[in-house]
Regions:
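A short glycine-rich, Lys/Arg-flanked "PGG" loop and its adjoining helix->strand segment in the class I
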Residues: 103-115
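Conserved SAM-binding strand-loop segment of SAM-dependent methyltransferases
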Residues: 66-77
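A short SAM/SAH-binding and catalytic strip from SAM-dependent methyltransferases
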Residues: 83-103
Length: 205
């Protein structure tokens, strides 16, 4: 992934992410905020937004770029505040690592949301990659991926990441008692999701 992606200007933000940002409401937690692209945008629009990162380096970069409220924490260990919107962009829910981890992410998200709170994120169906590149499907869920970044010849630590297809997402969300809206799909099998814990039926399926 080009480093420039993490330092985009407003005019470089893709349509899917603009739609997601336009749906933010109330107090926002930007999870996996990176270098603060989305947090800065929301901040400039007058939102109260906390930018969370597990990377201390990323937190320092955000502070230097002018993000006001930076939280250095592991999302799954964080329980200090409640929010109206939990935002996971650039496939931020990938931090779940596995399908079972996604269930845990949904459970923990409920504990961080206000009564009318919402979860907004994007993901991708990567099943086409196995056919296009003739890769044998793994024994585990095909969207559970191992990653390793490289920058100028330096390799980072390997890490696990999750891409989840719509059918699997909806099945798990319903089992975990969430209401789901698929709001947008692009030509690259990437899609935008808005979810609320079931009980508030203001979202129609």
């Amino acid at each position: 992934m080009p480093i420039e992606v993490f330092f985009r200007e407003e005019e470089d933000i893709p349509e899917l992410e603009f739609i997601a940002l336009s749906l933010c409401d109330g107090k926002v937690l930007d999870v996996g905020a990176g270098a603060g692209v989305h947090a800065l945008y929301l901040q400039e629009k007058g939102f109260e937004v906390d930018a969370m990162e597990i990377s201390a380096t990323a937190c320092k970069i955000m502070e230097k770029r002018g993000v006001k409220n930076v939280i250095h924490a592991d999302f799954f260990q964080f329980a200090e505040k409640k929010y109206d919107t939990l935002l996971f962009l650039m496939n931020g829910i990938g931090i779940a690592e596995t399908v079972d981890g996604f269930r845990n992410l949904l459970k923990h998200s409920k504990s961080l949301l206000t009564d009318k709170g919402q979860l907004i994120f994007d993901s991708s169906d990567i099943s086409y990659l196995y056919e296009e590149y003739r890769i044998a499907r793994p024994d585990h869920y095909f969207g559970e991926i191992n990653f390793q970044y490289e920058y100028k010849g330096n390799l980072g630590q390997p890490f696990k990441w999750l891409y989840i297809d719509q059918q699997t997402l909806i099945k798990i969300a319903h089992e975990e008692n969430w209401v789901v809206q698929i709001l947008f799909e692009d030509d690259n099998d990437q899609f935008l999701v808005r979810m609320e814990p079931r009980g508030d039926m203001s979202i129609e399926m």
